[in-house]
Amino acid sequence: MTLDDRIRNAAGPEPVFDPVMRDFLSNCADELRQRQRPGSLLDAADLGTSASWLWRLTFSTLGIARDDNDKLVSAARHTVGVRFLPDYLRRADRFEMLLLMEPEKPFHPNLRGQHVCLEVYPGEPLVEICEALHSLFSWRLRQLSEADALDAEACAWGRAHLDALPLDPRPLFGRTLELTLEPVEVGA
C-alpha cells in the first residue's frame, strides 16, 4: 500500500463541503502552489478528489528520529497527512487533522508515533500549518515542559542541547534571488 493510500484510508471518505469551505480549500491550495518553487523544502500532494481537503506534505527538514536500535539519528524526511473537515472554519482539532506518516519513530517533544501536537486554529491557512510543521520538525518550535510533552525524554534532550537548535535553519519555501553581475573596471 502506498503512502498516499495509507493517508486516504486513515482519513476516511471525502466529506461534503459547503460553498464557503470549498472556496477556502481552493484558496489554500492556490496559495500553497504559488509558494512552492525550486529549492522549497516541501513537496505537497493534493489527495482530494472534488475538493482540496486532504494533503500529503513531505518535508525535507532536518530533524531527529530513532533507528531500529532506539539510537538517535538524523531524519531528513517528515511526511504528514493533513485533513480538513467541513467545520474547520469554526473548529480545529489537531489530532483529527494531522497524522505523522514518516519517520516511523520520531524524536521530538511534540511527536509520538503518528500523533502531532501542534496548535492549529480554526480557519488557519494551509501555508501557515506547513510553516508551523517545518518549525516543529527543525526544533525551532517545541514543548519545553515534560509534563505537557508527548515525549518527555525528547523534551529534556532539547533543553540540554539549546545551543544546537534549531537543527535546520533553512526557510521552508525557497527564495529566488536575482543577481546581475557586471564587470568592475579597475583604475578608471
Regions found by a protein language model. Give the residues of each.
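Short beta-strand-loop-alpha-helix junction that forms the active-site gateway
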Residues: F84
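UBC/E2-like fold recognition across ubiquitin and ubiquitin-like conjugation systems
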Residues: M1-R77, D87-A188
